[in-house]
Each structure stands twice: as structure tokens, then as C-alpha cells.
Design a protein with these regions (language model features):
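Bilobed "Venus flytrap"/periplasmic-binding protein-like clamshell domains
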Residues: 12-70, 75-78, 179-182
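Pocket-lining segment of extracytoplasmic ligand-binding domains
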Residues: 58-149
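Phosphate-rich cofactor/ligand-interacting catalytic cores and adjacent structured alpha/beta frameworks
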Residues: 5-8, 69
Length: 184
């Protein structure tokens, strides 16, 4: 659907490796069952570091994952919430690691439609989504409302959610993001 995606600008805060030891001392890592991109990114990182821990697919619950493994990968709201609740267990931000290594943004997802989808409707949807996102960025009262709702839903402070939306993720793909996507 063109220029729409989920892009980290370095530190992403929502794709995190947790554990009570650094990654190079993890014998096994629990992977969530809800993200192929993040699992692939962690495998890339481990390969870059010459690490080969055993990787196990488990449900995305930090406590149960860490009862069974030295490390646990969490994404999305669960990662944001767990980082707030257990800051000492955060060992690695994968968005930051990708950008540090490649110098490029990390694209965690793109908005796509099946080839059989009506092209006119897809153009209309893309136009509307881009306009809404740009309005969110420009209109402070609208952003504050979204931030308040998201913070309440996830259980974080509005300041933390505002930082996440403005500094850590973007929903627009630019040339650099597309290059990062191609590299990945």
C-alpha cells in the first residue's frame, strides 16, 4: 500500500530482548509466537555476534518465558509494558542494534494488500491513512488524545507514549527506510 509501515528510527522500545544476563551469556532464548520479523531480526543479531543459543517458541509472557530460558524476546505493547515494569531485565533494543550496525532505519512491517484488492480502494485507503498520520503529527490536541488512550490501554505514562510515537517509531517509509527494508 505504498509509503506506509512500522519503522524504527534507532531505539524502538517495543522490540526488546529481556534476561538477567547479557546476550552473549544466554544459553537459550524464548521467542514469541506472534512476530516473524522480530524473530528474524534477533537471529540476524545473534549471527552478527557469532552467538548460537537455543531458540524456543513460547507464548509471549515474560515471566513464563524467563522461567524456561535465559532470554526472552517481546514485541509491541508487551515489550513496552515489561520494560517499564522490569527495566533491569532489558538487555537489548533490536531497533537500536540494527541502526547501530547498518546505519539504517529498521522496517518492522509494511502495510500491504492482496493483489486482487481493488486498486482504487487501496489508493483511497493509503491517502486516508497518510493524511490521518500526518494530522496526528501536526495536531497536538489530537496527538494528546491518542497518547492518553494508548497510555491507558498499555498501562504507561502519557509522556512515555508520546516519546514512543514521536521519537521511536514512524509510520511513513522514506528512501532510507526502503533501503533498510531492502537490506533486511
Amino acid at each position: 500500500v505504498g509509503e506506509l509501515g512500522i519503522v524504527s528510527l534507532g531505539h524502538v522500545g517495543s522490540v526488546l530482548l529481556f534476561g538477567d544476563r547479557p546476550p552473549d551469556h544466554m544459553r537459550d532464548i524464548a521467542f514469541p509466537t506472534d512476530s516473524s520479523t522480530s524473530k528474524r531480526l534477533l537471529r540476524w543479531y545473534l549471527g552478527e555476534q557469532g552467538l548460537d543459543p537455543r531458540c524456543i517458541d513460547l507464548g509471549p509472557d515474560l515471566k513464563s518465558m524467563l522461567q524456561q530460558c535465559d532470554g526472552a524476546l517481546l514485541i509491541g505493547d508487551r515489550a513496552l509494558r515489561a520494560a517499564s515494569e522490569y527495566p533491569s531485565l532489558v538487555q537489548l533494543d533490536l531497533g537500536a542494534e540494527w541502526t547501530r550496525t547498518t546505519g539504517l532505519p529498521m522496517v518492522f512491517g509494511i502495510f500491504a494488500a492482496h493483489r486482487s484488492a481493488d486498486e482504487e480502494l487501496m489508493v483511497e485507503a493509503r491517502t486516508e491513512l497518510v493524511a490521518n498520520y500526518r494530522s496526528f503529527l501536526r495536531d497536538q490536541s489530537r496527538r494528546e488524545e491518542v497518547v492518553r488512550l494508548a497510555a491507558g490501554k498499555i498501562g504507561l505514562t502519557p509522556d512515555r507514549m508520546d516519546q514512543y510515537f514521536l521519537s521511536e517509531v514512524s509510520n511513513l517509509l522514506d528512501e532510507e527506510s526502503v533501503e533498510g527494508l531492502s537490506r533486511f
